[in-house]
Amino acid sequence: MGIVLLSGCATNITPNNPVQVAKVPSPMTAPAPDHSGSVAKRLNDCIIRGNQSADALLVDSQVIAVTRNNSHAKALFSSADKLKDEQAKALTNYLAEANSCRPIALEGLSPEKKAVYEDFFKKIDGVYADLIARKITIGVANQERQLLMQDTHMKKLALQSK
């Protein structure tokens, strides 16, 4: 997910199911598009593919609120549970698929914007590693992820205003 940050570049494609819905900032706060139309489409397609697996569905409902309007989000953000073995395995598999989209997300970015993305990837990978190692709870992981996404969004807006 790093995924959600990646999906901020998604184009407007009508999803066939809720798992295909990528989180996108509201138009009022959305930064200028990071990618050309063809890169944005390839990135969106990659994200949608990753969000359709059984592991992605389990992660979205039991571990990390990946999709927009997730009916499990409130419970996930307040969960004091640590990962069970099945959840840790699903998250690991989901991340392997989702992280395959990262090279596309970095295509054509300015060095400054690329650095923002890479910093986000490094930090979110740390959150996921702590979650899988059971150092933090599901709730803490969701909260940290949200804070990282907001921080990254603000950094991208700051770059845009330069």
Q: What positions do the PLM features span?
A:
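Surface-exposed patches in mature extracellular/periplasmic domains of secreted proteins
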Residues: 54-61, 136-140
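Sequence contexts marking disulfide-bonded cysteines in secreted/extracellular proteins
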Residues: 10, 40-51, 100-102
